Amino acid sequence: MKFAALVAILADDLEERAIDSAKQAGGGGVTIIDAKGIGAEEKKTFFGLTYEGSQSVLLFILEKKLSVRVLKQLDRDLDLANTSKGVAFTLPLEHVAGIDPAQIRRFEQRIRDDI
């Protein structure tokens, strides 16, 4: 079975919507990391301090085909291409340890259901 990491870097206000969207598409557990970012365009400053707003980094470890489905669902539900409030992408994973065997069985069942 091949795995992928789906990474979504989003404005904090989209975090819950993104998690719900991923779950609807078959995504399971997620690791949430608080983050700050610096965009390509300069933002307004206040007394020399720039406030970009906080962001959330959502990290999902998914079966490869499922990661594409979840990514498309996130893009559809959050309108990432048009809102400039986030970015999502997948990365292939070569070696993975620590995934619950029950989760692997769920991935396998989802693949069989899709065939």
At which residue positions do the language-model features occur?
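Positively charged, small/polar-rich N-terminal and surface patches that mediate targeting and assembly
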Residues: 1-115
